[in-house]
Swiss-Prot record:
The lineage of its organism: Bacteria, Bacillati, Cyanobacteriota, Cyanophyceae, Synechococcales. One of its GO terms (biological process) is 'de novo' UMP biosynthetic process. Keywords: Pyrimidine biosynthesis, Transferase. Carbamoyl phosphate binds at R59, T60, R109, H142, Q145, G294, P295. Pathway: Pyrimidine metabolism; UMP biosynthesis via de novo pathway; (S)-dihydroorotate from bicarbonate: step 2/3. Pfam families: OTCace, OTCace_N. It is an enzyme of class 2 (transferase). SUPFAM superfamilies: Aspartate/ornithine carbamoyltransferase (SSF53671). The gene is pyrB. The keyword Cell membrane does not apply. Its EC number is 2.1.3.2. This is Aspartate carbamoyltransferase catalytic subunit. Catalyzes the condensation of carbamoyl phosphate and aspartate to form carbamoyl aspartate and inorganic phosphate, the committed step in the de novo pyrimidine nucleotide biosynthesis pathway. Transmembrane segments: none annotated.
């Protein structure tokens, strides 16, 4: 892993195809652990991973904690309801407390954009060795979700070699509340960097035209043409125009808790116009998988029948892929050398 250069993982904007390949390759090797009979690796033994989730979470938090434990790390969970935040302690001071306890990795989720980056900058200024992994911040980014979605699609398209090139030239349709979705933004960076063409579909109030130019500007520190054959982004207002020719469809939850004004006329109308069903998917012209980052609102983003159809819906596969992807990220950040490297080599041989 000598080519890995991301000390903190705050978003996917500056990830190269080589970075995506490194994560997916490790995740594939970690997926093989149950097959080999090994439930845990000593890769992060003696390391402390602290999950600082200032927002509710089921999948992401549990997945990160299980990933850390499977790498033999110690895990310390933070709960806002029983913390000193209720006594006026700041987020920064809370994070510093865990650093003082010896945390090697802080996995941070917060409703405000930029909090993980602020913590990373504070740690750098203080000369601390602790690294920050963004578990989701505001509307900005959810890098591990973008990576596990990429992994899920790569495994679907190329199960024998699920690497970034499996997405080259694929058409991925993302439907729903793009405006309030950090998942959508992370998927846009990951999918287009790997050569997929993305179609965003939803009403103007939830999919502003500004998203057409989402990937036109080069990522920070890269040239104007950083990735060969980078994918495109286009916006459609009707599912009937978005779905034909699709290779996969991702639908997103309506994030009513983040909506500051009335952006929808009603859930029934939304489902009528943008809800997925078996019948609607026939417009793709071929069998396609359906993804959703969860939690799913049955009968809104998709029908219950579609959600319960394992031949089409990959929601549970996304959850399964979350653990090896997060194992890969924790490994790359905290133990990309010495004994952990030799452990991985022995597994892959």
């Amino acid at each position: 892993m000598s080519g890995w250069h991301h000390r903190h993982i705050l978003d996917l904007a500056a990830f190269s195809r080589e970075d995506y390949a490194a994560v997916l390759d490790l995740a594939e090797r970690f997926r093989s652990l149950p097959v080999t009979g090994a439930r845990k690796l000593p890769a992060l033994q003696g390391r402390l991973v602290a999950t600082l989730f200032f927002e509710p979470s089921t999948r992401t938090r549990s997945s990160f904690e299980l990933a850390a434990k499977r790498l033999s790390a110690d895990v310390q969970s933070f709960s806002p309801s029983s913390s000193s935040l209720s006594k006026g302690e700041s987020v920064l001071d809370t994070a510093r407390t865990y650093v003082a306890m010896g945390a090697d990795v802080l996995v941070v989720r917060h409703r405000s954009t930029g909090v993980p980056q602020q913590l990373a900058e504070d740690l750098e200024s203080a000369g601390e060795r602790t690294v920050v992994l963004n578990g989701g911040d505001g509307l900005h980014s959810h890098p591990s979700q973008g990576l596990l979605d990429l992994h899920t699609l790569a495994r679907h398209f190329a199960p024998q070699h699920p690497m970034p090139e499996a997405l080259q030239g694929r058409r991925i349709v993302i439907v729903g509340d793009i405006l309030h979705s950090r998942v959508a933004r992370s998927n846009l960076w990951a999918l287009t960097a790997c050569g997929a063409d993305v179609v965003l579909c939803g009403p103007p109030s939830l999919v502003p035209d500004a998203f057409r130019a989402f990937v036109e500007a080069p990522p920070p520190g890269q040239s104007a043409d950083p990735v060969p054959q980078r994918g495109s982004v286009r916006v459609e207002r009707r599912l009937e125009r978005a779905l034909p020719g699709a290779d996969a469809v991702m639908t997103l939850r309506l994030q009513k808790e983040r909506m500051t004004q009335q952006l929808l006329t009603g859930l029934e109308r939304y489902h009528r116009d943008f809800g997925l069903s078996h019948e609607r998917l026939s417009l793709c012209g071929q069998p396609v998988p359906v993804l959703h980052p969860g939690p799913v609102n049955r009968g809104v983003e998709m029908t219950g029948a579609l959600l319960d159809d394992p031949s089409i819906c990959l929601v549970e596969e996304q959850v399964r892929n979350g653990v090896p992807i997060r194992m890969a990220l924790l490994y790359l950040m905290a133990a990309a050398e010495s004994a952990a490297e030799s452990t991985l080599v022995s597994i892959s041989s």
